[in-house]
Amino acid sequence: MHEQLSPRDQALEARLVELETRLSFQEQALNELSEALADARLTGARNAELIRHLLDDLGKVRSTLFADAADEPPPPHY
């Protein structure tokens, strides 16, 4: 039949269960953080692409408004 565990073995088993529980929670947290990081990277890539398009459009508008760079007003610090 089952042998009764000594107090030392019971303490070790309790510590092992606690460590396994902590590891499980840490693995879950790591997976959640990994997913959040992947989402953030995707959002960053989308935003970078959007900014590139906006800058492109701004350049086109600017070139339409100021066909010659000499016609463009000087920057505010002049």
UniProtKB/Swiss-Prot annotation:
Family affiliation: Belongs to the SlyX family.
NCBIfam families linked: PRK00846.1
Protein name (Swiss-Prot/TrEMBL): Protein SlyX homolog
Species in which this protein is naturally found: Xanthomonas oryzae pv. oryzae (strain KACC10331 / KXO85)
